[in-house]
Amino acid sequence: MFIENFKVESPNVKYTESEIHSVYDYQTTELVHDEKNGTYQWTVKPKTVKYEFKTDVHVPKLGVMLVGWGGNNGSTLTGGVIANREGISWATKDKVQQANYFGSLTQASTIRVGSFNGEEIYAPFKSLLPMVNPDDVVFGGWDISDMNLADAMARAKVFDIDLQKQLRPYMESMVPLPGIYDPDFIAANQGSRANNVIKGTKKEQIDQIIKDIREFKEKNKVDKVVVLWTANTERYSNVVVGLNDTMENLFASVDRNEAEISPSTLYAIACILENVPFINGSPQNTFVPGLIDLAIKKNTLIGGDDFKSGQTKMKSVLVDFLVGAGIKPTSIVSYNHLGNNDGMNLSAPQTFRSKEISKSNVVDDMVSSNAILYEPGEHPDHVVVIKYVPYVGDSKRAMDEYTSEIFMGGKNTIVLHNTCEDSLLAAPIILDLVLLAELSTRIQLKAEGEGKFHSFHPVATILSYLTKAPLVPPGTPVVNALSKQRAMLENILRACVGLAPENNMILEYK
């Protein structure tokens, strides 16, 4: 059974006009390695920590500024939100299609809230806490190309022509602000697009981005802004002591106009200084140590890296299943080809290397979780290939071969073929990232013994379900298994309304 909304009635939760206040018993374990009777042994001690959560229920008017607004992802997301807001339908060769938010965790998935008369009851994910309605989001952003969003949508060739015709009047007046362009960080083949760039030193470029954010906020009368990088994948930045390893050194490097400070890092610096959440949707190492240091000191949300949309999402499910079933993946070979501008930019070796790293690390935590299957230091052979094939456009092909060892020396091979519209998978993920980032800024918590409420850690692990290479605070374990990531996100939001985590025990029927 499906219900549209619900309210929790419990002594552990209180609703007021301004906030939801909940008390939550967090049950976890503590491990002790000590000597008993002359030998060392592990002891696991269950423990309960009481937390309190406060969620501001005022839903702000949200502005979203995209770096790379005129790219396939930016034009697809903007057009998709307009189509939903205006209730647009269009003819395809199969049927009349209605606008929807399929592919969005927040808008098109559900959570289990209990059972009634022997039937499971589900509610929309977005009903857990007050969230921004995507139809109300105001879009803007930057691009190194001055092409308006209607022409960018036509160039992308993602939407059906009938839909493009209906969207054009809404989008042809949308023109990106000039963006930061540094040809050293992206493929040379992107130079022909770069007719809309911010001149000056790196310090002057940061100042211009700050000015753009302030003017966008004022012009559109939005309460909050979230900035997200959906521009070209950059090459990795060199992390060097004295250059970008601390906040102070990073600022000094900007003042010296050091060449190794990337455009994406400059955008992030501007956002952090303005206390505006910044999310990196590409695989490069935007968040150099000095930038993370700055975000922590300014307590500004940062999240990333790289949208987890197709092949990698499947991988984080399948490898988790295999290792969890006691099957040993020994070889993972992933091949991709695509023909959009992302594929064109990734045809350069230095930018491909960034993508290869983010795609390759996705199985690490699952492998390290099972020392029965893997010896220390042992890891599956893992190869990732991406090729640019212009003809296929945004219709990305992904082929994977998983070879595993099974019972008594046997071998098992699984082969997958996945064809998808790259931007139609990425756009709802971008939407989820900005909506959840905004929601995160309205949640405060404190553990038993802490004197006052505080926000989540600025490095937003809560967004990890949506990213290939989750950014985590120093010393925090990285979790890539998709089911664990979703459970973490859902259960934190459940805690904010005083609900227990979904453990699937269903003891009442046992």
Swiss-Prot record:
The keyword Lipid biosynthesis applies. It is found in: Cytoplasm, Cytosol; Nucleus. Its EC number is 5.5.1.4. One of its GO terms (molecular function) is inositol-3-phosphate synthase activity. Keywords: Cytoplasm, Inositol biosynthesis, Isomerase, Lipid biosynthesis, Lipid metabolism, NAD, Nucleus, Phospholipid biosynthesis, Phospholipid metabolism. One of its GO terms (biological process) is inositol biosynthetic process. The keyword Nucleotidyltransferase does not apply. GO terms for cellular component: cytosol; nucleus. Its cofactor is NAD(+). Pathway: Polyol metabolism; myo-inositol biosynthesis; myo-inositol from D-glucose 6-phosphate: step 1/2. Its main location: cytoplasm. It holds the Pfam family Inos-1-P_synth. NAD(+) binds at residues 70-73, 143, 180, 190, 193, 230-233, 281-282, 306, 309, 340-342, 355, 393-394, 422-423. It catalyses: D-glucose 6-phosphate = 1D-myo-inositol 3-phosphate. Gene3D superfamilies: NAD(P)-binding Rossmann-like Domain. It comes from the Eukaryota. Belongs to the myo-inositol 1-phosphate synthase family. Key enzyme in myo-inositol biosynthesis pathway that catalyzes the conversion of glucose 6-phosphate to 1-myo-inositol 1-phosphate in a NAD-dependent manner. This is Inositol-3-phosphate synthase. The gene is INPS1.
